[in-house]
């Protein structure tokens, strides 16, 4: 490593770069990696996300684009409050220190960010604008307040996010968490359900997996609502939603959610029964919270192991037969899906069948299968209707259409689509977030803060040792005057969900002025390439799509889809290590034990995680191997979308390869006074083909294949000796996006006063790529002998025969032939 002083090279190259320049005459390209939470430390997993974006940004600049490549900080959130509690440090100070540290780390790896656009979501200059958005949403009817069920810690007297509930207890107090309804703010994302669903069709640059996950999350169901009258209650109905209205004659019961209005109106449950069902029913507010898995499956789709129902005192009447059916309150019916009520047809629904079996309810088959399938439940939408009165003899789809027309004509129902997507609850009972800009006045009720009085900022002096929300208990902050009457009022002490900040930051980057500047957004939006983990496929990406539509509706921007293309990079994985007691070890701890001769169990390669201690510290890697080696290796082995296995051997190999490039270029520089070497036609064709392939792979973001082409070019130049200013420039130009420091440094040695960053990409001759010849390397025992040009349609035997002439009389023991690449003769006699 002695002759590759990467620290000196990094310092030199970074002093040359200016990433803030813009040329609005050029076509724009906006590349954005999801901005980080300032936790204080970057690991290798972060590196992959940001380097992918940087490679694309550098490549697009070299193609002449006006590239927007910004960075910022998703700076609000719970960890800062935890730090305040555990370490007695103010969240703002903790966050600012972490940002400073991470900013230094990001700059050290040569990321070409326009730092003049840097933003932090915890800055009042940033969140002032989202307070304005909220007021606009309120005026447009997109924001509202209602009671909603939450996790309540009775000791700390505060609302807990799901991740703060551990085994049913509060993370801080250890108290048993209870469900409680409190007023919460919501955004009407459900109003955009169909639009969000249809919009996915236009996102041809998104992975199909992500679009499928969002489709499932939105959860469109086509069906009908049908009214069942309540026996003994004149003019009272239960509206039932069903996706299978044709099975109405197989109904043997109805069921409603524990949160259905009738439960309270008709006093259907005792307190004990209500609590039993609440415990057995997945908390409906969990459907949209911070820590969901990202399978795209909602709680509404989950099938409970136990179908629990409590039989009520009332019955409902079948809308056609008039038969009385029992009414249950059941744990598998959700208030905010459909109508919060269902009819059960056990013969043709798996869930209903399980419920009927448990409660001994009738099971009447109303579809006769064409096949010999007589087992119940029969859930296919195929067959002929039977036991169904006027529907008998119809095919299932025909009967469905007929029954919908029937219920519509007699006024007991209609066709209806239902969506699982629920409104977004944006209230959080936390200090470290954006204050909600409303006040409450006894005389005037809820009133929005005047725009000229924004931003509503957080108080600096807060006490985190008291129970509950620090804003709620602040002695002065929450007391203010009503914007309408001027009388005493109280501020809303909730803050926005942190997804609020990340739902529009991409638009804020378009202008250095801050906020959303419509003309700047017209220039840069939508984002051309958005890069981040697939764990954000549902919540963040769906919220951002909704938020863009809401901003469009309120006149802020003209687009409705924020991200034209999406790349979900794979996880970075690493071996796990355990000591003899089974405790996980950090890699450096495992190395230390091995050096002492102690036993270390090496486990499988898994996603890097703090819990398994298989994380690799980015600063240590950069300090030991340099930024370029880390960048180069992280993109080498697998496509960006696939998982990547980190290894010491791999990073060391990348370091040595870059050192080899440096030596190769310096060899040329030291010999160029002897005169330029003329590059032969065969080598020119080979280089031309490499440039062509490299360009194709960069356009397709097959970055691992592009890295392979860099290796191929280095091998070609080394073997052929075709070192010239022209060929070295080609090498450095295609190397620059991946290893920018070394490429820039060597380019400065190749030609004075030339900056490689932003210089044009190397061109290739299309005619030469169409050549009917191919050039192969001929090797003997792995060592380069000569290049051999052969016709593309030559057989393997012909190629080996021609190549063999180049090794003269050597005794060949084995031939290794790689089509289109190489012939290697393994010889026992030198010949």
Swiss-Prot record:
Subcellular location per the Swiss-Prot or TrEMBL entry: Cytoplasm
EC number: 6.1.1.4
Pfam families with a match to the protein in the record: Anticodon_1 (PF08264), tRNA-synt_1 (PF00133), tRNA-synt_1_2 (PF13603), tRNA-synt_1g (PF09334)
CDD domains recorded: LeuRS_core
UniProt short sequence motif 'HIGH' region, positions renumbered to this chain: 36-46
Key words, A-Z: Aminoacyl-tRNA synthetase, ATP-binding, Cytoplasm, Ligase, Nucleotide-binding, Protein biosynthesis
Annotated binding of ATP, by residue: 610
Family: Belongs to the class-I aminoacyl-tRNA synthetase family.
Protein name: Leucine--tRNA ligase
This protein's encoding gene: leuS
CC terms in the record's Gene Ontology section: cytoplasm
Reaction(s) the record says it catalyses: tRNA(Leu) + L-leucine + ATP = L-leucyl-tRNA(Leu) + AMP + diphosphate
InterPro entries, alphabetized: aa-tRNA-synth_I_CS, aa-tRNA-synth_Ia, Leu-tRNA-ligase, Leu_tRNA-synth_edit, M/V/L/I-tRNA-synth_anticd-bd, Methionyl/Leucyl_tRNA_Synth, Rossmann-like_a/b/a_fold, tRNAsynth_Ia_anticodon-bd
Motif residue range(s): 'KMSKS' region: 607-611
Domain of life: Bacteria
GO biological process, any: leucyl-tRNA aminoacylation
GO MF term list: aminoacyl-tRNA deacylase activity; ATP binding; leucine-tRNA ligase activity
Species whose genome carries this gene: Neorickettsia sennetsu (strain ATCC VR-367 / Miyayama)
């Amino acid at each position: 490593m002695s002759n590759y002083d990467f620290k000196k090279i990094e310092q030199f190259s970074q002093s040359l770069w200016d990433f803030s320049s813009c040329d609005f005459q050029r076509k724009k390209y906006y590349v954005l990696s999801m901005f980080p939470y300032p936790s204080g430390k970057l690991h290798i997993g972060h590196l992959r996300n940001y380097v992918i974006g940087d490679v694309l940004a550098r490549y697009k600049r070299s193609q002449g684009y006006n590239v927007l490549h910004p960075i910022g900080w998703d700076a609000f959130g719970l960890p800062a409050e935890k730090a305040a509690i555990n370490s007695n440090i103010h969240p703002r100070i903790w966050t600012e220190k972490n940002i400073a540290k991470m900013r230094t780390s990001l700059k050290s790896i040569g990321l070409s960010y326009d730092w003049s656009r840097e933003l932090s979501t915890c800055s009042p200059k940033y969140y002032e604008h989202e307070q304005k958005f909220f007021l606009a949403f309120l005026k447009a009817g997109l924001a509202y307040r209602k009671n909603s069920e939450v996790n309540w810690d009775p000791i700390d007297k505060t609302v807990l996010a799901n991740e703060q509930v551990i085994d049913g207890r509060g993370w801080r107090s250890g108290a048993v968490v209870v469900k409680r309804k409190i007023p919460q703010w919501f955004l009407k994302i459900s109003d955009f359900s169909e639009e969000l669903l249809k919009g996915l069709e236009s996102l041809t640059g998104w992975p199909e997996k992500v679009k499928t996950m969002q489709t499932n999350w939105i959860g469109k169901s086509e069906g009908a609502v049908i009214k069942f009258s309540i026996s003994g209650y004149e003019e009272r109905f239960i509206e039932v939603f069903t996706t299978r209205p044709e099975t109405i004659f197989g109904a043997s019961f109805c069921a409603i959610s524990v949160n259905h209005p009738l439960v309270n109106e008709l006093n259907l449950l005792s307190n004990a029964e209500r609590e039993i069902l609440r415990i057995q029913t997945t908390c409906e507010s969990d459907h949209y919270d911070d820590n969901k898995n990202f399978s795209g499956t909602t709680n509404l789709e989950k099938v409970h192991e136990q179908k629990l129902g409590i039989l009520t005192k009332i019955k409902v009447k079948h809308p056609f037969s008039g038969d009385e059916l029992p009414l249950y309150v059941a744990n598998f019916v959700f208030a905010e899906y459909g109508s919060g009520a269902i009819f059960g047809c056990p013969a043709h629904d798996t869930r209903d069948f399980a419920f009927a079996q448990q409660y001994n309810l009738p099971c009447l088959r109303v579809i006769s299968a064409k096949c010999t399938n007589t087992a119940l439940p029969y859930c296919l939408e195929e067959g002929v209707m039977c036991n169904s009165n006027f529907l008998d003899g119809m095919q299932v789809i025909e009967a469905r259409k007929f029954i919908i027309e029937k219920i519509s004509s007699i006024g007991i129902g209609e066709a209806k689509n239902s969506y699982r997507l629920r409104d977004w609850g944006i209230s959080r009972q936390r200090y470290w977030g954006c204050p909600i800009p409303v006040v409450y006045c006894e005389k005037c009720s809820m009133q929005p803060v005047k725009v000229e009085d924004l931003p509503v900022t957080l108080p600096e002096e807060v006490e985190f040792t008291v129970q509950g929300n620090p804003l709620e208990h602040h002695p002065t902050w929450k007391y203010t005057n009503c914007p309408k009457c001027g009388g005493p009022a109280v501020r809303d002490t909730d803050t926005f969900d942190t997804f609020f900040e990340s739902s529009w930051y991409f638009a804020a980057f378009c202008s250095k002025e801050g906020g959303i500047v419509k003309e700047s957004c017209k220039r840069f939006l939508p984002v051309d390439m958005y890069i981040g983990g697939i764990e954000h496929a549902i919540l963040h990406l769906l919220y951002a799509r909704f938020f863009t539509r809401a901003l469009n509706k309120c006149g802020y921007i003209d687009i409705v889809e924020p991200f034209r293309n999406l790349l979900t990079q794979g996880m970075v994985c690493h071996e796990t290590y355990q000591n003899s007691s089974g405790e996980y070890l950090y890699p450096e701890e495992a190395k230390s034990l091995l050096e002492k001769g102690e036993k270390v169990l090496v486990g499988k390669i898994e996603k890097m995680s703090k819990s398994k201690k298989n994380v690799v510290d980015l600063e240590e890697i950069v300090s030991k191997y340099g930024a370029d080696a880390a960048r180069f290796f992280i993109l080498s082995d697998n496509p960006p979308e696939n998982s990547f296995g980190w290894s010491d051997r791999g990073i060391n190999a990348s370091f040595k390869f870059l050192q080899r490039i440096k030596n190769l270029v310096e060899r040329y520089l030291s010999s160029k006074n002897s005169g330029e070497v003329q590059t032969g036609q065969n080598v020119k064709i080979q280089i031309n083909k490499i440039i062509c392939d490299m360009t194709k792979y960069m356009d397709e973001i097959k970055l691992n294949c592009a890295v392979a082409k860099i290796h191929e070019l280095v091998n070609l130049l080394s073997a052929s000796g075709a070192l010239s200013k022209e060929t070295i420039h080609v090498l450095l130009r295609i190397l620059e996006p991946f290893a920018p420091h070394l490429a820039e440094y060597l380019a400065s040695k190749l030609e004075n006063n030339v900056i490689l960053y932003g210089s044009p990409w190397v061109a290739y001759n299309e005619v030469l790529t169409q050549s009917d010849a191919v050039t192969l390397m001929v090797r003997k025992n792995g060592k380069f002998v000569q290049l051999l040009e052969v016709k593309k349609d030559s057989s393997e035997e012909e190629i080996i025969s021609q190549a063999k002439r180049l090794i003269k009389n050597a005794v060949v023991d084995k031939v290794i032939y790689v089509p289109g690449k190489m012939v290697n003769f393994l010889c026992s006699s030198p010949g």
